[in-house]
């Protein structure tokens, strides 16, 4: 099982993406109130397979429920008061030294149990169709391996995730303190709400929304680019080409576009700054506050 974990993590290397594939909705996996490691193995299949190794920690046994094609996994760490959900028992999440290998060296404090090393936590192996759809909450650290036609990942906790190169579209939503690493993709839509960061390889069309102090960094873009920041988070695009670059900032967040843009439209309300290395088309700007727009290297 350790070999499976290592091979899936290694698949995050930013190699060239394969030819685009048409994405169709796939069955969904929801993981909640859990401390766990997850490995998603992508296969030619229509259903979802789940294998669990409980590990050596004193965490509750994971419960797996099926609702049609969808799968729900409950880690048993949810708290209720008078029948009302009060969050979970997870505190003080610490990531490992290498976020390309989520869970290695990580630990988390669990109420009434103490500190749990992720290497002792349950290991969930998910065998998924090529259109991957995962929602995770709690302290769930996971990798999604190669071969996906599309990936939809929602990370609403403190765990880190790594997504290997994807043939088609990637949608990565982050709410909490965890980080997400994304390989190459045909298009990328990412929503960062909280203190976590998203780091991605080359993509085509890009849509980024940041609300909070989290950051998004993309190696390369080749397509329409839409960036929205509400808060102090930053967006960095290292290089690439975008026929239309649309930026909206409300707050102190900054945008650094290191490629070549065609038409550029910037709206700033606050102290945010926008730098575009090169613009070949029309540049429009609306600034209220101390923000600034700079074109040129």
Protein language model regions, located:
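Conserved G/P- and acidic residue-centered "switch" motifs that form tight phosphate/ATP-binding loops
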Residues: 176, 194, 251
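Acidic (Asp/Glu) and glycine-rich low-complexity loops/linkers
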Residues: 21-174, 179-191, 199-201, 243, ...
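Gram-negative bacterial Sec-dependent N-terminal signal peptides
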Residues: 1-21
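Short, surface-exposed interaction patches in beta-rich subdomains
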Residues: 198-297
């Amino acid at each position: 099982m350790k070999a499976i974990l290592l091979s899936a993590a290694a698949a995050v290397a930013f190699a060239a993406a394969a030819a685009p594939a048409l994405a169709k909705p796939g069955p969904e996996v929801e993981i909640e109130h859990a401390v766990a490691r997850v490995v998603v193995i992508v296969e030619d299949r229509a259903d979802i397979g789940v294998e669990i190794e409980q590990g050596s920690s004193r965490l509750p046994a994971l419960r797996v429920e099926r609702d049609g094609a969808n799968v729900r996994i409950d880690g048993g760490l949810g708290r209720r008061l008078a029948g009302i959900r009060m969050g979970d028992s997870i505190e003080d999440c610490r990531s490992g030294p290498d976020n390309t290998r989520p869970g290695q060296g990580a630990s988390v404090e669990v109420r009434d149990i103490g500190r749990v090393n992720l290497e002792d936590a349950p290991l969930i192996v998910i065998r998924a169709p090529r259109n991957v759809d995962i929602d995770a909450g709690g302290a769930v650290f996971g990798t999604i391996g190669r071969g996906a036609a599309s990936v939809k990942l929602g990370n609403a906790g403190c765990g880190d995730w790594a997504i290997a190169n994807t043939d088609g579209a990637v949608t990565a939503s982050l709410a909490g303190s965890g980080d997400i690493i994304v390989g190459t993709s045909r298009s990328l839509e990412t929503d960062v709400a909280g203190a976590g960061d998203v780091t991605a390889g080359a993509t085509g069309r890009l849509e980024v929304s940041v609300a909070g102090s989290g950051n998004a960094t993309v190696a390369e873009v080749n397509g329409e680019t839409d960036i929205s920041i509400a808060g102090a988070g930053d967006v960095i695009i290292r290089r690439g080409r975008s026929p239309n670059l649309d930026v909206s900032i409300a707050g102190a967040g900054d945008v650094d576009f290191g490629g070549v843009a065609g038409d550029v439209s910037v709206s700033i309300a606050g102290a945010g700054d926008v730098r575009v290395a090169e613009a070949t088309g029309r540049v429009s700007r609306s600034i209220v506050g101390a923000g600034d727009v700079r074109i040129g290297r």
